[in-house]
Amino acid sequence: MAAATLRDPAQQGYVTFEDVAVYFSQEEWRLLDDAQRLLYRNVMLENFTLLASLGLASSKTHEITQLESWEEPFMPAWEVVTSAILRGSWQGAKAEAAAEQSASVEVPSSNVQQHQKQHCGEKPLKRQEGRVPVLRSCRVHLSEKSLQSREVGKDLLTSSGVLKHQVTHTGEKSHRSSKSREAFHAGKRHYKCSECGKAFGQKYLLVQHQRLHTGEKPYECSECGKLFSHKSNLFIHQIVHTGERPYGCSDCGKSFSRNADLIQHQRVHTGEKPFTCSECGKAFRHNSTLVQHHRIHTGVRPYECSECGKLFSFNSSLMKHQRVHTGERPYKCSECGKFYSHKSSLINHWRVHTGERPYECSECGKFFSQSSSLMQHRKVHTGEKPFKCNECGRFFSENSSLVKHQRVHTGAKPYECRECGKFFRHSSSLVKHRRIHTGEIQ
């Protein structure tokens, strides 16, 4: 890096808003994610402070105060900037006012000429319709890449782009400006939460954080009445009502209303699973899925059935269970019209019509239509009999066999013949008995 001393500002004419602004269109602004917009807000504040210290902003206190207390950093602040411009804060301000503030800066030799072009003669103030001004200091180094990337509005907000502070300003500055800049670069956090002790570098971040403790949600959607703790979340939510989906997947063309949703979706194509369970090492595509999975290890069951009090780890499991009480059977077989309460039950039933038997016994090669049938069959090979009769101590390989056996002890005969009213302990016995009435058995 070669040191280059800037020309005497007094020889460079007037500084206008065009000299210290980069524009984004509304479309370009949408390409920025929340983190980039937050960085934009932070550097806006720094640039305002710098311009004020150089005597280039007559309404220093008002503008800086607005930015410091700016509650929502994710929305464009061109209203603040424009109001200052229209009042003539910069228009016609001579660069010689900052002559005693001149400094030596580190500039790549290949970019010295380009860097000096910032300080050319007076240009008329001209507001570009529909574009968002992003302030930058006339002492901020601009890389060629940053200037070329204005079309997409991405590198302009990266750490290597136009918003990165690459120079230390020397000379006399106001006490407030120096203190603000020192805190900005040193990463100091003066605003502390009285509830949890977490500290923040800027007041608006503390205000937003405190809503976690108070539960305050001051932003209401005018369409559906839903409340939000942050204005940015409200703006993102409102896209649902407009139907706008500006974020498109380059792999499959699917569109999303939020950039975060697009990022999550792209993991389907990349196979990325960044969320890993610390207990078993299983990886997941979404953090919410990991949170749900973790309940398997902790045993947490936060969802309770209001009818019977049974607890569930997942809300989806509770909803399925509640169909036992409501009798709801939303899944219908298109072949025979039979209804089922669970989709998995319909899938299993469908194999009756298709004849599909996807489950094979590794011991004898026999196929089954349901995995439960295969599991029961395997006990024939293993000799396992986990079901014990409490009356006589006899063991059975299947629970259904135990239930049938227990009727010997209870005397239960649940199967009735409609012809003669006779009862039977097993359905197979009833089937045989019916043949007497049909004439099959003489």
Curated annotation (Swiss-Prot):
It comes from the Eukaryota. Transmembrane segments: none annotated. Its main location: nucleus. A zinc finger (C2H2-type) spans 191-213, 219-241, 247-269, 275-297, 303-325, 331-353, 359-381, 387-409, 415-437. Pfam families: KRAB, zf-C2H2. Residues 15-86 form the KRAB domain. One of its GO terms (biological process) is regulation of transcription by RNA polymerase II. Keywords: DNA-binding, Metal-binding, Nucleus, Repeat, Transcription, Transcription regulation, Zinc, Zinc-finger. One of its GO terms (cellular component) is nucleus. The keyword Repeat applies. Signal peptide: none annotated. GO terms for molecular function: DNA-binding transcription factor activity, RNA polymerase II-specific; RNA polymerase II cis-regulatory region sequence-specific DNA binding; zinc ion binding. It is found in: Nucleus. May be involved in transcriptional regulation. Belongs to the krueppel C2H2-type zinc-finger protein family. This is Zinc finger protein 773. It comes from Homo sapiens.
